[in-house]
């Protein structure tokens, strides 16, 4: 069966767009898994909700405190805070980028 060139092009375009969307979602999903694994004991890791530890900021509010784009370097070098309850974490650059992608996904859409 022969398909018109337009149908082949449309099918290829659909596959490309679908593949790109899946690749874009992957870092956000990875970041969400990482924060749920390492941060959820103390922080609300969703856009809303209360943190289990009162002094731990909700991740949905981090953009109000920091430009989350700059957190990637701190996540790789190790975040150290003034309060002793927070453990020091060090992530590899891919993990840090995924966490930042997830945090950005929590910011309100303008």
Describe the residue ranges of each PLM region.
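N-terminal hydrophobic targeting signals that begin at the initiator methionine
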Residues: 1-3
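Bacterial N-terminal signal peptides
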Residues: 5-18
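Electrostatic cytochrome c docking/interface patches
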Residues: 15-34
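A short, structured loop/turn motif at beta-sheet edges
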Residues: 23, 65, 93-95
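Gly/Gly-Pro-rich "capping" loops immediately C-terminal to redox-active cysteine motifs
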Residues: 28-32, 47-76
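The canonical Cys-X-X-Cys-His
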Residues: 31, 36-45, 99
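Axial heme c-ligation environment in periplasmic c-type cytochrome domains
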Residues: 53-61, 74-106
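Short, solvent-exposed mixed-charge patches
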Residues: 109-110
